[in-house]
Amino acid sequence: MSGGKYVDAEGLLYSVPSRDQGNIYKPHNKTMADDLPEKQLYDAHTKEIDLVNRDPKHLNDDVVKIDFEDVIAEPEGTHSFDGIWKASFTTFTVTKYWFYRLLSALLGIPLALLWGIYFAILSFLHIWAVVPCIRSYLIEIQCISRVYSICIHTFCDPLFEAIGKVFSNIRATVQKEI
């Protein structure tokens, strides 16, 4: 089989691989591609948004999922007319639905802009200020921690060891008096 040539799906002519890993001149051929998992890279700015499930991480499950029954309830024995109850339900639901849409139409884009700027600033400060300060602090504190450790081992360890030996000889007996 060595010395044979074949054409792959892309129309390239090359010799039959003489190794299990594939042809060294084209290492990512089909036999190797099955062995090596390839990661597909996606740009975060071009991802598609889901117009049906707009809360995929369930951020607002407990907070703003308010229905008519969560706000208005009539206890047993105190009921209004059925027509009033149905009209109240419809009024509440439709008002909440359309007023939310109106507010999101008026304020959604400006607030998205403000929150985008805020989180961009927050990310920038975290990446370029907070993390470097913490890393710098940890590097500087290592020197102090070594000196502190030497002082503890030099002065405190013998003192506490001596106190431990003194108190290790104390014996207590408990007697129950009747």
Curated annotation (Swiss-Prot):
It is found in: Golgi apparatus membrane; Cell membrane; Membrane, Caveola; Membrane raft. The modification N-acetylserine is found at S2. Phosphorylated at Tyr-14 by ABL1 in response to oxidative stress. It is a peripheral membrane protein. Residues 149-160 are annotated as: Interacts with SPRY1, SPRY2, and SPRY4. The keyword Mitochondrion does not apply. The modification N6-acetyllysine is found at K5. GO terms for cellular component: caveola; cytoplasmic vesicle; endosome; Golgi apparatus; Golgi membrane; membrane raft; perinuclear region of cytoplasm. Residues 2-94 are annotated as: Required for homooligomerization. GO terms for molecular function: molecular adaptor activity; oxysterol binding; protein kinase binding; transmembrane transporter binding. Keywords: Acetylation, Cell membrane, Golgi apparatus, Isopeptide bond, Lipoprotein, Membrane, Palmitate, Phosphoprotein, Ubl conjugation. The modification Phosphoserine is found at S2. It comes from the Eukaryota. There is a cross-link at K5, K26, K30, K39, K47, K57 (Glycyl lysine isopeptide (Lys-Gly) (interchain with G-Cter in ubiquitin)). Residues 105-125 dip into the membrane without crossing it. Homooligomer. Interacts with GLIPR2. Interacts with NOSTRIN. Interacts with SNAP25 and STX1A. Interacts (via the N-terminus) with DPP4; the interaction is direct. Interacts with CTNNB1, CDH1 and JUP. Interacts with PACSIN2; this interaction induces membrane tubulation. Interacts with SLC7A9. Interacts with BMX and BTK. Interacts with TGFBR1. Interacts with CAVIN3 (via leucine-zipper domain) in a cholesterol-sensitive manner. Interacts with CAVIN1. Interacts with EHD2 in a cholesterol-dependent manner. May act as a scaffolding protein within caveolar membranes. Forms a stable heterooligomeric complex with CAV2 that targets to lipid rafts and drives caveolae formation. Mediates the recruitment of CAVIN proteins (CAVIN1/2/3/4) to the caveolae. Interacts directly with G-protein alpha subunits and can functionally regulate their activity. Involved in the costimulatory signal essential for T-cell receptor (TCR)-mediated T-cell activation. Its binding to DPP4 induces T-cell proliferation and NF-kappa-B activation in a T-cell receptor/CD3-dependent manner. Belongs to the caveolin family. This is Caveolin-1. It comes from Ornithorhynchus anatinus. The gene is CAV1.
